[in-house]
């Protein structure tokens, strides 16, 4: 019987990156936290879905907190100490994710809201009737 060879993909080299940028994309359905270096190369990322939440629970502040903690842990392993935070989107996990990054041990130097605002672009989705 043929044995399947164990695949070992290209391992990311552990590098020492002292400061970077945390991108928090918070929608009503999910929160994605990506931490990059100053050049834009992603160091660590996590999301509410990757943290084990499913369905409507992905949009909760607690799910955003868990995702931010997981991303911060991976970034701290790479030697990150200071971050700038760029927040995008209207979701409920915005503030919670920022607080979780701070509690995890990352020093926040800047918080900026980069939510895209349309100058009367696409038509909005129709109103929900429940």
Swiss-Prot record:
GO cellular component, one term: ribosome
Gene Ontology MF term list: rRNA binding; structural constituent of ribosome
Chain ranges passing through the membrane: none
BP-aspect Gene Ontology terms: translation
Gene3D superfamilies linked: Ribosomal protein S11
Domain of life: Bacteria
Keywords per UniProt: Ribonucleoprotein, Ribosomal protein, RNA-binding, rRNA-binding
Subunit structure: Part of the 30S ribosomal subunit. Interacts with proteins S7 and S18. Binds to IF-3.
NCBIfam families the record matches: PRK05309.1, uS11_bact
Free-text function comment from the UniProt entry: Located on the platform of the 30S subunit, it bridges several disparate RNA helices of the 16S rRNA. Forms part of the Shine-Dalgarno cleft in the 70S ribosome.
Family: Belongs to the universal ribosomal protein uS11 family.
Designated name of the protein: Small ribosomal subunit protein uS11
Gene source species: Synechococcus sp. (strain CC9902)
């Amino acid at each position: 019987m043929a044995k399947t060879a164990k695949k070992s993909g290209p391992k990311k080299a552990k590098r020492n990156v002292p400061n970077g940028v945390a991108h928090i994309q918070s929608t009503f359905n999910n929160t994605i936290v990506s931490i990059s270096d100053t050049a834009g190369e992603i160091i660590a990322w996590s999301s509410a879905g990757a943290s084990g939440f499913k369905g409507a629970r992905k949009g909760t502040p607690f799910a955003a907190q868990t995702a931010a903690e997981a991303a911060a842990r991976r970034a701290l392993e790479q030697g990150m100490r200071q971050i700038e935070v760029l927040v995008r989107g209207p979701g409920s996990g915005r503030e919670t994710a920022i607080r979780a990054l701070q509690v995890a041990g990352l020093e926040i130097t800047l918080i900026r809201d980069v939510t895209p605002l349309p100058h009367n672009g696409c038509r909005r989705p129709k109103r929900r009737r429940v």
